[in-house]
């Protein structure tokens, strides 16, 4: 006879726990956060904006890493256990990824805060963004099904990058349809034009957000692998000489693009300390941008209502979940990120044309067709 296991709550954020982790009952999300923070010695970099008095709960656990880590220690999570596991792994000569030590298992483990998120707290408070979060959860679960056999993230090369996003593009399309009924109701021709800009802006935003979440300078990709921007010669590795330009030339040509993306998007995202709901709000605001040229006529009437709904959701979220946060100040910080993101998207699109023109590490044909709205 099967006996139902008693589910205890996470000692840190109070969602359903996953058992004992490092000395205390915790969910997968808080266990991963504690392991990552301890192994990378990130705690000294954390700063609380509220005099170290933040209330840590499921819906706001990402808002203050300093107080979250302090609570992990308070409830009994032991850093020495993390260090002992690391030392044992080194002695066993197990493969490790020094550039991205925060991810040590499958993509699902790296992204467990999203996969384990309960949406009940958000449904009435942020109805529009709740729908986007639910769709984003589905995207992550589908990615897990696609990439689960790979247990350890690693530095990827250019060819693998193209394959990853040639497969992921279909999942992103489903994510956009599931997030916004305005998009789902469009015709096929109109959807292609809207998705073109969404694909690039979402690609850049998500890479920046995931890299911030992992606390790494590497660029984290959809499947959990990463681009080691400190060693771009490995990214542009071309052992069979299939490309018309040398890897060294590609590094010189494209490194300014990586630097621009980090400076204008990734670093501001990290400075803003985005929560998940804020990241998805940025995705929504970028998707429905009435200042974009070349979109179908049916697109523009939806932009302002969607944006107003997203901003209203954020305001409600701040007032209920973070009463000490000035909504106007926080919102202005988010909106200031948008112009730099738009410039990065334009540069990305221009670079794609250069790649194709000179056949210097061009993207997969499938990606070009998407960008061209075919």
Swiss-Prot record:
GO terms for molecular function: DNA-binding transcription factor activity; RNA polymerase II cis-regulatory region sequence-specific DNA binding; zinc ion binding. Residues 7-84 bind DNA. It is found in: Nucleus. Residues 124-374 form the NR LBD domain. InterPro entries: HNF4-like_DBD, NHR-like_dom_sf, Nucl_hrmn_rcpt_lig-bd, Znf_hrmn_rcpt, Znf_NHR/GATA. Orphan nuclear receptor. This is Nuclear hormone receptor family member nhr-57. The gene is nhr-57.
């Amino acid at each position: 006879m099967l006996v139902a296991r008693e589910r205890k709550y996470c000692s840190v954020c109070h969602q359903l726990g996953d058992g004992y982790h490092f000395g205390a009952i915790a969910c997968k999300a808080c266990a991963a956060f504690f392991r990552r923070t301890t192994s990378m010695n990130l705690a000294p970099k954390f700063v609380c904006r509220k005099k170290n008095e933040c209330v840590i709960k499921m819906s706001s656990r990402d808002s203050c890493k300093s107080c979250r880590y302090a609570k992990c220690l308070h409830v009994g999570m032991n850093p020495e256990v993390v260090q002992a596991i690391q030392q044992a792994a080194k002695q066993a000569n197990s493969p490790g990824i020094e550039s991205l030590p925060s991810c040590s298992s499958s993509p699902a483990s790296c992204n467990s805060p999203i996969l384990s998120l309960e949406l009940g707290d958000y449904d009435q408070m942020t109805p529009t963004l709740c729908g986007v979060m639910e769709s984003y959860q589905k995207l992550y679960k589908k990615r897990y099904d696609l990439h689960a056999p790979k247990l350890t993230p690693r530095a990827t090369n250019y060819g693998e990058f193209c394959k990853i996003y040639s497969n992921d593009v279909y999942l992103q399309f489903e994510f956009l349809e599931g997030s916004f009924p305005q998009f789902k109701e469009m015709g096929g021709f109109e959807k292609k034009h809207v998705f073109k800009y969404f694909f690039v802006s979402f690609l850049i935003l998500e890479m920046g957000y995931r890299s911030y979440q992992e606390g790494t300078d590497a660029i984290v990709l959809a499947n959990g692998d990463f681009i080691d921007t400190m060693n771009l010669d490995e990214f542009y590795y071309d052992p069979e000489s299939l490309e018309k330009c040398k890897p060294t030339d590609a590094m010189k040509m494209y490194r300014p693009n990586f630097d621009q993306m980090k400076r204008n998007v990734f670093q501001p995202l990290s400075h803003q300390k985005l929560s998940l709901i804020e990241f998805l709000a940025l995705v929504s605001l970028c998707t429905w941008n009435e200042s974009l040229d070349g979109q179908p006529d049916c697109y523009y009437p939806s932009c302002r209502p969607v944006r107003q709904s997203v901003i209203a959701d954020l305001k409600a979220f701040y007032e209920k979940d973070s009463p000490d946060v000035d909504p106007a100040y926080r919102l202005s910080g988010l909106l200031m990120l948008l112009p730099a993101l738009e410039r990065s998207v334009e540069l990305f699109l221009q670079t794609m044309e250069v790649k194709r023109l000179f056949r210097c590490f061009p993207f997969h044909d499938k990606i070009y067709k998407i960008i061209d709205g075919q």
